[in-house]
Amino acid sequence: MSAISKNIIIINKPIKWTSNDVVQKVKRVIGAKKVGHAGTLDPNASGVLVLGINEGTKLLTKLILDNKSYIAEIKFGTSTNTYDAAGEIVSSTNRMVTLTEVTKIVKDFYKNDYWQKPPQFSALKINGQKAYVLARQKVDFEIAPRLVKIFKYQIMDFNYEKQILKISLHVSKGFYVRSFAVDLATKINNLAHLLTLIRTQSGPFEIKDAIEIEQVYDYWNNINKYL
């Protein structure tokens, strides 16, 4: 089912779209007065974006607290200023990491909650301004770490030659997979950035429930066809 009602729409956000791009597009297409989302998904990521429509926006304060699931590809050996492939390369190393090293550290993160510092290139507000705006302006600022948790994970693949880890993660709200990539590499004295990211689930909503952005008008006007 693509939605619990006309108040909630689940979108498969395309890569290169910001979450706000999706919000504004949907608002225009269906002529809604109010549209909001239940958790920012980075432009370089795709997947589940939960939208509240009109009265549905009142549900977002609860939905944003939901745990989320991702499939990520992490590239070791190179760091970027944004912690993902969209950023500028900051540093690199020739040191190769092994699957044994990676597995051990992922298990360590899994065992306990840990304090994670969000990326400076993020949509978090710092004194009323979005952090990524300040970061682009090279303003010096700090983001307080937050307590996060990995509930479940699966190492899906590790390509030693390309130094790419593919991993699925089921995590608490506020968890930044970009920061996890950097934290993971740091623990094994290496560098890394997030290569790709798909949000596969947000609370009860899975990617199989999502519709494409091009389907929004048809969905809104023919909802029974999608239920």
Swiss-Prot record:
Gene3D superfamilies to which the protein is assigned, alphabetical: Pseudouridine synthase
Single GO molecular-function term?
tRNA pseudouridine(55) synthase activity
Q: What InterPro entries has UniProt attached to this entry?
A: PsdUridine_synth_cat_dom_sf, PsdUridine_synth_N, tRNA_psdUridine_synth_TruB
What positions constitute the catalytic site? D42
A Pfam short name = TruB_N
Could you list this entry's UniProt keywords, alphabetically sorted: Isomerase, tRNA processing
BP GO annotations: mRNA pseudouridine synthesis; tRNA pseudouridine synthesis
Q: What reaction(s) does this enzyme catalyze? A: uridine(55) in tRNA = pseudouridine(55) in tRNA
Q: Identify the SUPFAM superfamilies for this entry.
A: Pseudouridine synthase
> Which Enzyme Commission number(s) are listed?
5.4.99.25
Output the PANTHER family linked to this UniProt entry: PSEUDOURIDYLATE SYNTHASE TRUB1 (PTHR13767:SF2), TRNA-PSEUDOURIDINE SYNTHASE (PTHR13767)
Xref: NCBIfam families: TruB
Function of the protein: Responsible for synthesis of pseudouridine from uracil-55 in the psi GC loop of transfer RNAs.
Q: Which family does it belong to?
A: Belongs to the pseudouridine synthase TruB family. Type 1 subfamily.
Report what the protein is called. Answer: tRNA pseudouridine synthase B
Q: Which gene carries the instructions for this protein?
A: truB
